[in-house]
Amino acid sequence: MNALGRHILAEIYGCDAAILNNRNLIEKIMVESALEAGAEVREVAFHKFSPQGVSGVVVISESHLAIHTWPELGYAAVDVFTCGEKVNPWDACNYLTERFKAKHMTATEVKRGVFEEPVKVANL
């Protein structure tokens, strides 16, 4: 069965707290990770929380990358969802793990849009 997309749910631990609490740097690294994976970036939106933490999304032509950070725990929750064959979501996850100076990353890949029977696409 072919899937429409691949969705990586990554748990990134032991990260540099200063990086995880820097909105501008998180945005830069997230955009770089999308490009590293071969994606085409469309939009970005990031928010810095008080007293700490950053959440954000990078919208790509192929879907999205999202992040939520807990600097006080050295932890980042990351989603990388890509459609098509051009972009490798694992490249983005590995890039993020390296740039966050993480000690450990675990991840699960979920196939999205898996149809057991042929689907007729409607003309819209």
UniProtKB/Swiss-Prot annotation:
Heterotetramer of two alpha and two beta chains arranged as a dimer of alpha/beta heterodimers. Signal peptide: none annotated. It catalyses: S-adenosyl-L-methionine + H(+) = S-adenosyl 3-(methylsulfanyl)propylamine + CO2. Catalyzes the decarboxylation of S-adenosylmethionine to S-adenosylmethioninamine (dcAdoMet), the propylamine donor required for the synthesis of the polyamines spermine and spermidine from the diamine putrescine. The lineage of its organism: Bacteria, Bacillati, Bacillota, Clostridia, Eubacteriales. The active site is at S63, H68, C83. The gene is speH. Pathway: Amine and polyamine biosynthesis; S-adenosylmethioninamine biosynthesis; S-adenosylmethioninamine from S-adenosyl-L-methionine: step 1/1. The keyword Lyase applies. Its EC number is 4.1.1.50. Is synthesized initially as an inactive proenzyme. Formation of the active enzyme involves a self-maturation process in which the active site pyruvoyl group is generated from an internal serine residue via an autocatalytic post-translational modification. Two non-identical subunits are generated from the proenzyme in this reaction, and the pyruvate is formed at the N-terminus of the alpha chain, which is derived from the carboxyl end of the proenzyme. GO terms for cellular component: cytosol. The modification Pyruvic acid (Ser) is found at S63. Its cofactor is pyruvate. The keyword S-adenosyl-L-methionine applies. Binds 1 pyruvoyl group covalently per subunit. GO terms for molecular function: adenosylmethionine decarboxylase activity. Belongs to the prokaryotic AdoMetDC family. Type 1 subfamily. One of its GO terms (biological process) is spermidine biosynthetic process. The record marks E62, S63 as: Cleavage (non-hydrolytic). InterPro entries: AdoMetDC_C (IPR042286), AdoMetDC_fam_prok (IPR003826), AdoMetDC_N (IPR042284), S-AdoMet_deCO2ase_core (IPR016067), S-AdoMet_deCOase_pro-enz (IPR017716). This is S-adenosylmethionine decarboxylase proenzyme.
